[in-house]
Regions:
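Alpha-helical promoter-recognition and RNA polymerase-docking modules of transcription initiation factors
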Residues: 1-121
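Charged, low-cysteine interdomain linkers and short loop/connector segments
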Residues: 114, 121-152
């Protein structure tokens, strides 16, 4: 893993600004710049994956390397889906880009954790509703699990 000190971070910021300046319009977006963006945002993937690995969400079901792999796959998908017009119009382009990519990376890692978590796989819409409510709607969760166990 790459460790960043202050000089490397300054170099990372200038490289990111140059890359975003080159890709103001979707027509100038090429495979080289796509690979450059993926490489530039890999430390973001590592950071997010480490946060998930140390939290209780991924304990026991996925290793840190699996989380980094899922995050990097979702980073590649997110870079392909970036709306460059929105990035060009925003005042702080780096912040806009990071927020978009981090949402996509976190969502992909959460989805991977949910699919690898237990013996019984829940449908994605059910896990999303449980995550949104975060256990507040215990009656709906209990009804769902009772319906599953009664059908067995």
């Amino acid at each position: 893993m790459k460790h960043y000190n202050i000089q490397n971070y300054i170099r990372y910021k200038t490289d990111l600004e140059k890359t975003i300046a080159r890709i103001k319009i979707k027509e100038h977006y090429s495979l080289y710049e796509r690979d450059t963006l993926v490489t530039l945002f890999m430390p973001l993937v590592e950071n997010i994956a480490r946060k998930f690995a140390t939290s209780q969400q991924a304990s026991g079901c996925m290793s840190i390397l699996d989380l980094i792999q899922e995050g990097s796959l979702n980073l590649i998908k997110a870079v392909d889906r970036v709306d460059w017009d929105t990035i060009a119009k925003s005042e702080d382009q780096e912040k806009t880009m990071k927020s978009f990519l981090s949402k996509r990376i976190k969502g992909g890692i959460r989805r991977a954790i949910d699919t690898n978590r237990g013996q019984m796989r829940l449908p994605e819409h059910v896990t999303n509703s449980i995550r949104k409510n975060f256990g507040k709607d215990k009656k709906a969760v209990a009804m769902f699990f009772n319906s599953i166990f009664l059908s067995i």
